[in-house]
């Protein structure tokens, strides 16, 4: 009886701790817990609900986590395949830059994901101005890059977008970072 009371007390204490339900549910999606997302959506939650830390939707988390079945479920429930996170990334950007499968990228594209969406990060965040193809190329995701090309995907440079590169950040007086380094600067 004493152990039962202790166990009940522990569960009551845990229940009093305030967890950010959105973050824990988004993490469950990333980890592939399809039961958690089904339960959350059944409770009336918005399919495109964003977490507060990364400002990503369930579709972002499922895509980044390589969770194909959850991606399918979310799309069936009306998830916006072109929703952006706090960095301006779509789920397709994340599919190209993480361990997501080619099948996830194909599914997103087949449901209308913009293959040339630009991520434009807010000031103070990482460098923006990349397409899903740029992300796939940087992530050495050759199969996804080929898929994006097949569907008309282009790099930001090919689209004529003046985006920041590491070299452009390092330029000083028209010189590249390598030129400045060679001069001792």
Positions of PLM-derived features:
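Bacterial signal peptide processing site
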Residues: 17-19
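Ankyrin repeat boundary/linker residues
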Residues: 51-52, 85, 119-121, 126, ...
